[in-house]
A protein has these predicted regions:
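Transition-metal
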Residues: 1-18, 94-113, 137-139
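Glycine- and acidic-residue-biased ligand/ion/polar-headgroup-sensing regions
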Residues: 17-31, 36-43, 73-76, 144-170, ...
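Short alpha-helix capping/helix-loop boundary micro-motifs
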Residues: 46-50
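Ligand-binding loop in jelly-roll beta-barrel domains
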Residues: 68-80, 85-86, 171-173, 182-203
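C-terminal, non-catalytic macromolecule-binding modules
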Residues: 73-127
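Conserved short histidine dyad/triad with adjacent acidic residue
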Residues: 121-127, 136-152, 171
Length: 203
């Protein structure tokens, strides 16, 4: 009874062109852009109105600690998380939602999201600081023909986001991944201008 009028108001605002992607009305309407159902409206719609709406520029990042309710609304992203079997859903999904456990674990303290630009490690590689011992993430940007050598401390994964590279005589293109063993020294040669992301376990 409460959600339907809210969605109707959102639809009117979008139709008038008075809202942008920085307004929760825009996203609430997008979820039900094909029509507002008469029953069983997803209660997760409420979360759009209480969460921060954050636009993360290309190749920038954000760290979200345990207990932070979040949703990815648009675009492509890389998500790293600690090994866990207790992921809880808050809505916007047909899957089961354990409300009691969700309330128990969610951190209800207001936050001011901070965009991570990355810290320079070398001319080619930047590190996104993550204040946890479970994982780390770097971005490697190479010009065409450039060769870059990395030494792995742990089991590491490389994801090619843009371009094409040769890693130890094997060709990789955008969307491909390579798994590196611990204590390996690997040469990456960029066939074209290339961007890769490296996931690793910190020392």
């Amino acid at each position: 009874a409460i959600l339907k009028p809210l969605l109707e108001e959102a639809a009117k605002a979008v139709a008038k062109g008075t809202v942008t992607k920085n307004d929760p009305h825009w996203w609430a309407h997008k979820y039900y852009a094909d029509g507002i159902p008469t029953k069983n409206i997803d209660k997760g719609i409420f979360s759009i109105y209480i969460l921060n709406i954050v636009n993360i520029p290309k190749y920038k990042g954000i760290f979200q600690g345990a207990g932070i309710l979040h949703a990815y609304l648009e675009g492509q992203n890389i998500e790293l998380m600690a090994n866990s079997d207790n992921v809880l859903r808050g809505g916007l999904t047909p899957k089961h939602i354990d409300v009691k456990e969700l309330i128990h674990h969610v951190n209800f303290v207001p936050t001011n999201p901070s965009i991570l630009k990355g810290d320079k490690l070398t001319d080619q590689e930047i590190n996104y600081p993550c204040p946890v011992p479970d994982f780390g993430l770097t971005k490697i940007a190479l010009n065409q023909g450039e060769v870059y050598t990395i030494s792995s401390y742990s089991l590491e994964m490389l994801l090619v986001m843009d371009g094409e590279v040769i890693i130890e005589d094997m060709a990789y293109k955008a969307g491909d991944t390579a798994l590196l063993t611990a204590n390996a020294k690997v040469k990456i040669k960029a066939h074209t201008a290339t961007v890769l992301f490296k996931a690793y376990v910190p020392k």
